[in-house]
Amino acid sequence: MRLRTAACVLLAAAPALAGVPGKGDGTITLLGGLRAIPGGEYQSETGAKHGLWHPGFLLGLGFQLDDELHGGIQLGYGLDQYGEGAGALKIRSFQILLELDTALAQGSWYTVYAGGGLGYSLNTISRAAGDLEANSAVGFVSLGFRFRISDHVGGVIEERYSISSAAADPSATNTVNMGGNLLTAGIIFHFFSPQDKGHPTAPGG
């Protein structure tokens, strides 16, 4: 009898363990934060002054495929700079990424996830000798935390590490690091949960 009662309790609680977002949700994620970009061999070669911290932003359009798997397309934007004044080398990066993540742990109001992805970085380099394009492939891994704020809004904290480099300075033998760490926080909008009144259902469902 006790076993049957416990089973009934677990079945009744199952929808509450869905995590954030829930299965079948479409998602829009807005994130902003700081990039830590090591200057590496390029900075050692040129001796250019370089700050470690720079702003970074992400916009994600995704879909919760099942209770644990979430994927989508992300658009990223970041800034970087080497040197000062008229001779500075300024970098603007626009990234197009395919991303997939899976839940490591989840409850009724949160999801801890790990993910990764691949994409392309469109890098515009501004320098005294003239602007140039130095595009590059990019790959990343991530670890994050999503938590419920309201029925269709959640918070997100994410740390990711990207690998990417580009020949941004023709006068140097080493490439410029376009990757590094990105720590962001923001919000996720999720909609069309199976429990929502407006969610599409099968005929007769």
Model-based region annotation:
Residues 2-9:
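Sec-dependent signal peptide recognition
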Residues 18-65, 118, 182-205:
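Short glycine/proline- and aromatic-enriched beta-strand/turn motifs that initiate or cap beta-hairpins
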Residues 41, 48, 74-77, 141, ...:
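Predominantly the C-terminal beta-signal and adjacent terminal strand-loop region
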Residues 13-15:
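N-terminal signal peptide c-region/cleavage motif recognized by signal peptidases
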Residues 40-45, 83-86, 124-129, 167-171:
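Short acidic, glycine/proline-rich loop/turn micro-motifs
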Residues 27, 111-113, 154:
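Structural motif
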Residues 60-130, 136-137, 149, 184-191:
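Gram-negative (and chloroplast) outer-membrane scaffold detector with strong preference
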